[in-house]
């Protein structure tokens, strides 16, 4: 009885957890439905707003088409007025051209007279052009002298640096010479001291032959070193003399260059003085030329005045009628002047109106381009919506395939479950048919141990299933999306069925092991204790997982059917909206093509 109560307590929390899972799945499905409904409402409101915007745009386009017609009428009237005004202006231009031709003839006569005067001036100026040529040649020479002076300055700087380096070398060599001379003097003093010592110790030579041999070697070495030092001193003296000669040569060259620079500077100063004197002469000559030119102009004006007087005196008698005629023309022009001013004001107003019309037309074109851009954007959004709908359809198809596979797996698990149940009932019947006398010789300690181990295994598996359900419950709140909850529930049901099957197989194996008798020492037992675990096993098996999986599959199928219906409705709405947009764009394009054709005509 205790085992039965334990197994029923292990089964009831599993069923409760499965019911909680089903409730959570229903809540998820309802939340998804609410989200879909909200999205559908938002899309419908957006579509309504877009339809209203399109209707407003159509009304604006119609109004602007009417305005364009009115503007065309105004343009026709303005063109007629412009034709009349152009004819009037052409007549005035012809009169002005006649007057201009007269003025050109007079100007040509004056130009010929001035050309004659200019020729005489050119002959005088040809003699004066020789002086600028000489100035240019002098300027070139000055530039050449300046370039040479720059080169000499650079060479002088180089020579100075070379002299500085030579002085430094000379100082170093002089120091080395002094050192060598000091060393030579030291060696000579040492040699003199060594020569005096052997003279003093001449009677003691036979005793010190062996001792004097290393002293002789040292003296030879010292002599060799002295010879080397003398040769080095001679070489240094020669190099010093050479450097002194080079320094003297360089100093002489520097003096020569300095003299040349001084001579060049003197020549440049002379050339500058000559240039200044020539500039003064040129200025005086230019002043005289300007004075003569002014006098010639005055003489020409006097001659023209005299010629005009002669002509006026000659033409005074026959030309008395012409001033009267000109006066009449002037009076007519003065009387017509206000009319011309009015016409000009009208033309200005018409031009301003035309500019306003052009600006309005440009604004209309900009608005039309903006509307076309908006239509293009709407088409793009519709295309994106269609792509999303296609993706949703694919996802739904994939989910349906997954669910079909899960249903097939559930059917297979149901079949296995039924087979295990039949085997279980068969084994129970076999256990009931056995004689109780046989069980007296069976090792009940082994049987009870195997049954307890199987029960403990089942309890451990039940606890593990509970922990897995708790983990799934925690993960479902955070990461389950769309239809993953269905897949998790189906996988869990499938695992629980497989585990129950394995538990049934283990129980059947324990029963078969118990059927084999063992000749060990018999133990006293009661029949109730033997039948109680079997009854407990019989109560553990019917956990009814097929009913739960069937409910989940029905809910999933119902949800998928609703999703398919909504997707189809969305497709229909989008198709109708796309057709309306295409019709509207075709209508607007036809309208504006007709307007453009009429403008070209």
Curated annotation (Swiss-Prot):
Pfam families: CEP63 (PF17045). The modification Phosphoserine is found at residue 544. It comes from the Eukaryota. Transmembrane segments: none annotated. InterPro entries: Cep63/Deup1_N. Keywords: Cilium biogenesis/degradation, Coiled coil, Cytoplasm, Phosphoprotein. GO terms for molecular function: identical protein binding. One of its GO terms (biological process) is centriole replication. Residues 115-135, 188-213, 307-326 are annotated as: Disordered. It is found in: Cytoplasm. Disulfide bonds: none annotated. Residues 121-131 have a biased composition (Basic and acidic residues). Its main location: cytoplasm. One of its GO terms (cellular component) is cytoplasm. Residues 14-59, 86-197, 226-278, 340-397, 555-586 form a coiled coil. Interacts with CEP152; the interaction is mutually exclusive with CEP63. PANTHER family: DEUTEROSOME ASSEMBLY PROTEIN 1, SARCOMA ANTIGEN NY-SAR-24/CYTOSKELETAL PROTEIN SOJO. Key structural component of the deuterosome, a structure that promotes de novo centriole amplification in multiciliated cells. Deuterosome-mediated centriole amplification occurs in terminally differentiated multiciliated cells and can generate more than 100 centrioles. Probably sufficient for the specification and formation of the deuterosome inner core. Interacts with CEP152 and recruits PLK4 to activate centriole biogenesis. Belongs to the CEP63 family. This is Deuterosome assembly protein 1. It comes from Rattus norvegicus (Rat).
């Amino acid at each position: 009885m205790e085992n039965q109560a334990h197994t029923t307590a292990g089964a009831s929390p599993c069923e409760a957890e499965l019911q909680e899972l089903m409730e959570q799945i229903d809540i998820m499905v309802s939340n998804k439905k609410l989200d879909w409904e909200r999205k559908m409402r938002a899309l419908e409101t957006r579509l309504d707003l877009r339809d209203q915007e399109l209707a407003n745009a159509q009304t604006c386009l119609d109004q602007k088409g009417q305005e364009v017609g009115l503007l065309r009428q105004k343009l026709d009237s303005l063109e007629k007025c412009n034709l009349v005004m152009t004819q009037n202006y052409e007549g005035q231009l012809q009169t002005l051209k006649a007057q201009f031709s007269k003025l050109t003839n007079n100007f040509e006569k004056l130009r010929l007279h001035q050309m004659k005067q200019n020729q005489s001036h050119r002959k005088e100026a040809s003699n004066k052009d020789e002086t600028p040529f000489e100035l240019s040649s002098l300027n070139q020479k000055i530039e050449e002298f300046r370039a040479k002076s720059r080169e000499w300055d650079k060479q002088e700087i180089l020579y100075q640096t070379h002299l500085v380096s030579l002085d430094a070398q000379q100082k170093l060599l002089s120091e080395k010479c002094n050192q060598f001379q000091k060393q030579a003097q030291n060696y000579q003093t040492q040699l003199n001291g060594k020569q005096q010592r052997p003279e003093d110790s001449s009677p003691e030579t036979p005793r010190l032959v062996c001792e004097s041999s290393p002293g002789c070697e040292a003296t030879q070495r010292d002599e060799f070193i002295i010879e080397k030092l003398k040769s080095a001193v001679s070489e240094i003296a020669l190099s010093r003399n050479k450097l002194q000669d080079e320094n003297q040569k360089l100093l002489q060259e520097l003096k020569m260059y300095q003299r040349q620079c001084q001579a060049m500077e003197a020549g440049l100063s002379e050339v500058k003085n000559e240039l200044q004197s020539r500039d003064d002469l040129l200025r005086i000559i230019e002043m005289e030329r300007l004075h003569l030119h002014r006098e010639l102009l005055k003489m020409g004006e006097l001659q023209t005045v005299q010629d005009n007087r002669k002509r006026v005196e000659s033409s005074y008698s026959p030309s008395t009628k012409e001033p009267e005629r000109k006066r009449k023309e002037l009076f007519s022009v003065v009387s017509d002047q206000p009319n011309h001013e009015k016409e000009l004001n009208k033309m200005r107003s018409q031009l301003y109106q035309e500019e306003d019309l052009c600006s309005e037309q440009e604004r209309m074109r900009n608005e039309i381009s903006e509307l076309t851009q908006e239509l293009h954007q709407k088409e793009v959004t519709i295309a994106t919506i269609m792509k999303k709908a296609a993706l949703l359809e694919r996802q739904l198809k994939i989910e349906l395939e997954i669910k079909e596979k899960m249903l097939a797996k559930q059917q297979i698990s149901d079949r296995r479950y039924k087979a295990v149940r039949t085997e279980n009932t068969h084994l129970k019947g076999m256990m009931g048919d056995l004689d109780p006398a046989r069980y007296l010789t069976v090792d009940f300690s082994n049987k009870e141990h195997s049954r307890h181990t199987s029960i403990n295994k089942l309890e451990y598996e039940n606890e593990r299933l509970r922990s897995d359900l708790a983990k799934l419950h925690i993960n479902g709140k955070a990461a389950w999306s769309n239809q993953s909850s269905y897949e998790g529930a189906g996988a869990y049901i499938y695992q629980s069925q497989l585990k129950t099957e394995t538990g049934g197989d283990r129980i059947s194996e324990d029963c078969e092991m118990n059927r084999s008798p063992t000749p060990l020492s018999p133990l006293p037992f009661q029949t109730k204790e033997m039948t109680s675990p079997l009854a407990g096993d019989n109560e553990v098996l019917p956990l009814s997982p097929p009913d739960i999986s069937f409910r989940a599959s029905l809910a999933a199928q119902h949800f998928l059917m609703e999703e398919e219906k909504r997707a189809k409705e969305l497709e229909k709405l989008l198709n109708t909206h796309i057709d309306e947009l295409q019709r509207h764009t075709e209508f607007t394009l036809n309208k504006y093509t007709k307007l453009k054709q009429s403008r070209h005509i």
